[in-house]
Swiss-Prot record:
Lineage: Eukaryota, Metazoa, Spiralia, Lophotrochozoa, Mollusca
Further remark: Found in injectable (milked) (IV) venom.
Protein name per UniProt: Alpha-conotoxin CnIL
Molecular function terms from GO: acetylcholine receptor inhibitor activity; toxin activity
Domain notes per entry: The cysteine framework is I (CC-C-C). Alpha3/5 pattern.
Organism annotation: Conus consors (Singed cone)
Coiled coil ranges: none
């Protein structure tokens, strides 16, 4: 393969990768918004001193 052919193949790979990655970025933005909404609901709920994280579970009751 000549240098021109290798450069052309390189450009095709870069352009294909760029075009394929754009739709997946826009799809993940919608999922991120939904996840943020769910997370805000968790923070608004009353915990009453409960912690469900394994590191602090021995000090606080999880309530599950």
């Amino acid at each position: 393969m000549g240098m021109r052919m290798m450069f052309t193949v390189f450009l095709l790979v870069v352009l294909t990768t760029t075009v394929v990655s754009f739709p997946s970025d826009s799809a993940s933005d919608g999922r991120d918004d939904e996840a943020k909404d769910e997370r805000s609901d968790i923070y608004e709920s009353k915990r009453d001193g409960r912690c469900c994280h394994p590191a602090c579970g021995k000090y606080y009751s999880c309530g599950r």
